[in-house]
Amino acid sequence: MRWRCALLTWIPLSVGLAGALTLRQGDRNSAVRVTIYEDLQCPDCATFQRMLDEKLLPRYGAKVVFEHRDFPLARHTWARKAAIAARFFQGVNPELAVTYRRYALANRRQINAANFEERLAAFAKDHGVDPQKAVAALQDPGLDAAVEKDFQEGVARGVSKTPTVFVNGAPYIETFTFEELSKALDAALVAAR
């Protein structure tokens, strides 16, 4: 499988809150904004991630900004830890954060609560990051607060399922097609001219 390159940036949300970063892919200056509330243990989020990588970013990455938000569902035993780990990797390198998110989603059937830290340490080591620091980051209150901030923002916007994707404020919930998002993005791009 070939991955297309997308512009990745991170932007601090507030000074002093460790890990409080918004992970953005695509054109960060675009007037058209896609906000993605995701759970890294969610099968529908894994399907959406493939759509994002294979269709949305190649077609819209130069024209639209895609912003990731963490929304770990309580029923998923390791989703919150995965969100915290993704925030840790984001502080190391935004591209590594995207790689970790892809990894967690692609390997969600092999990862479980019992082996989560072992899998996290192996991922870190494979990507040149100190495994002990990656595992220790799971206890970082700043990273946890950043995940919680995203979660509470999602709750305030009515998010209860993942993925929930907002295209310029209009929600697409859990299962939707590329064609539905493409139509909304095309209309938003025309309106933004």
Locate predicted features.
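Structural alpha/beta surface segment adjacent to cysteine/selenocysteine redox centers
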Residues: E38-L40, A46-K125, A191
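Extracellular/periplasmic catalytic domains that process cell-envelope and extracellular macromolecules
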Residues: D27-S30, P58-G61, W78, A156-S160
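A short beta-strand-turn-helix
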Residues: G19-V32
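Positively charged n-region of N-terminal signal peptides that target proteins for export
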Residues: M1-R4
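Residues at or immediately flanking beta-strands
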Residues: R33, K63-V65, T164
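C-terminal cap of thioredoxin/glutaredoxin-like
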Residues: Y37-D39, R50, A121-R193
